[in-house]
Amino acid sequence: MDAIKKKMQAMKVDKDGALERALVCEQEARDANTRAEKAEEEARQLQKKIQTVENELDQTQEALTLVTGKLEEKNKALQNAESEVAALNRRIQLLEEDLERSEERLGSATAKLSEASQAADESERARKILENRALADEERMDALENQLKEARFLAEEADKKYDEVARKLAMVEADLERAEERAEQGENKIVELEEELRVVGNNLKSLEVSEEKANQREEEYKNQIKTLNTRLKEAEARAEFAERSVQKLQKEVDRLEDDLIVEKERYCMIGDSLDEAFVDLIKGLEPFWNPRNPKPPTPKLPTPTPEELAAMEEARAAAEAAAAAEAEAAEAAAAAGEAGPDGAPAAPGEEKAPAKEPTPPKEPTPPPPPPPPFEYSIDLPPEGAEVPYVKNYEPPPPGSEPEPVPAAEGEAAPAAEGAAPPAEGAAPPAEGAVPPADGAAPPAEGAAPAAEGAAPPADGAAPPAEAAAAPADAAAPAAEAAPAEAPAAEATAAEAPPAEAAPAEAAPAAAEGEAPPA
């Protein structure tokens, strides 16, 4: 009922506010009308001035346009005010409908209240009926007492009659005996009546005791109701306090959970920084890849075109021709070495030291991609961990050792592994022979390394000319499509001993043939 009254009061307040706003809007509309009338009067005055003053025609026209614009604005404002008034009227109607609904609810609530009062009246009537029954029982007890008195009086009268009859029938023994028997029967009846009277008295006493007990129970029940009401109020107060404490604890738990998430994120960032520090401090340690810092994908080499394949075949044929020419030169040098001790020494400059194969350049490591988004299930350490999680060092797999650093300029590169030794009887290099690959340029630092699965260069392949510098950009190994042809090149090149330098023109051709496809 209080909520309904509050709602009705709030609705009345809204209604009064709406009516006040409607009155304010009407007053604004009236003000706008008065202003419009004033503007019309000003326009008339301006027209008179225009007629009288022709020189100020332009100024008055501009003022007229301004006044007409203001008039239109006022008309628009008036229309808006009318629309607002209509909206407020609709709102008032809705509020009246809500008021009617609330009145209906109030009527239903009053009906329920009347039903409850009727039920209370019925219970009160039942209590009065029980009291009336108790009074009727008391009246019955009084009537029984009166009947008992009458029975005693009748018994006394019977005794008197018995005495009279005994005196009259004293002479007749049979009558006397009968009278005695009757007297005995009367005495028995008197005893029975006395016993009944005692039973009735006991019942009356028990009823009085039960009535007293009932009164005591009623008082006890009232006291229990009062105590239960007080306990109920205390329990409600405790429940409200418990709800408030639970809300406070829930807020504290939410705050602690947020702090825990922030600390876990900071812990993961510290772990990543520690991993990066370990990678920077320990040389040869592979970086720690994780979902935040994934491993970059291996770049794929493009598939060579038919034109590039044809160029590679031509370069391979030119390399084989150069190897055959070097083999012939080696045979000629061997023959000249055999003839040298007999009195025909080899001319200086005929033989040269075998050129050493240049090392392939390294491929630059691409920069790592940006880390992925943070994931608690992956990035956080296992539960119960007391120390930071650091990945143990794993040695690199066999075959992935770093390549040796190429020799500096002016120094000879080490001989290729598996290179064919000089033929027996070959003359040592002459004193005036040019050192091998003195002017050869070292491989560029940014050159790409050999692709996975690509065939390595032939161990015994013929070196390029001593005077020709190997181009750094074309010094990459062959593509992935040439693994089948590598054994044949190794077999042919292993048979050829080191010989004199091939013509300078063969070196660029061989280098172009070994270059990977663009």
UniProtKB/Swiss-Prot annotation:
Record's compositionally biased regions (Low complexity): 318-348, 406-518
Keyword GTP-binding: no
Region: Disordered, residue numbers: 101-125, 288-518
Gene Ontology terms, MF aspect: actin binding; actin filament binding; kinesin binding
Distribution of this protein across tissues and organs: Both isoforms are only expressed in indirect flight muscles.
A Pfam family: Tropomyosin
Annotated localization: Cytoplasm, Cytoskeleton
Skewed-composition ranges (Pro residues): 293-305, 357-374, 394-405
Family matches, as InterPro entries: Tropomyosin (IPR000533)
Gene3D superfamilies per the UniProt record, alphabetical: 1.20.5.170, 1.20.5.340
Coiled-coil intervals, chain numbering: 14-267
Record carries keyword Cytoplasm: yes
Similarity remark: Belongs to the tropomyosin family.
Comment text on domains: The molecule is in a coiled coil structure that is formed by 2 polypeptide chains. The sequence exhibits a prominent seven-residues periodicity.
Protein function: Tropomyosin, in association with the troponin complex, plays a central role in the calcium dependent regulation of muscle contraction.
Subunit structure: Homodimer.
Protein name in the entry: Tropomyosin-1, isoforms 33/34
Organism: Drosophila melanogaster (Fruit fly)
